[in-house]
Amino acid sequence: MTFTTCGGGAFLHIPKTGGTWVYYLLRENGMVASPFGHEHGHLHNEEWAFCVLRHPFGWYASHAAFQRASGFSTWTGAEHPLAEIVHHQHPTIDGMVRAILEESPTFLSRMYGKFLDSSKYVLRNETLVDDIMSLSDKVGWSIRLRSFREGRRNETPHGELSDETKRMIEECDPDAFVQYVNAPNV
């Protein structure tokens, strides 16, 4: 779902952050120019680019829930951003997150870093509607939310992580939290 936009930009789709919703919203509004490269590519030649980040707790919970719901799919190729962690399987969300952190403790900050290095604007999953409207104002798009105001696309319901798992995420990958807080906002 990585694509160029009308107005000389590019959307860089970080998995499990709300990118499918962004794609469908912009497509419905005629802002998608053309897909490019890999579905989740982070390199581009456009004037500017944007991506969406998700709070690290939410990102890990969403990824683990999606993997469980898909039957632990290993659908990624070697170039996919999740290739390093997609093989993890565990019957609980907490167990899967802990297994990922034990093998790849800084995975999320490394993945976020690749996309942040190429992005001028950063939206947050938790404030996505407001952020996409702010971006629209900055880059001169005319976006109508229509049915998109309520709900998401491709959203996997997930539970809360345990306090123990949250502490483990904070200890293993503090840079992911720094990136989430300090990335340039819209």
Q: Model segments located where?
A:
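Membrane-interface amphipathic segments in extracytoplasmic regions
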Residues: 1-186
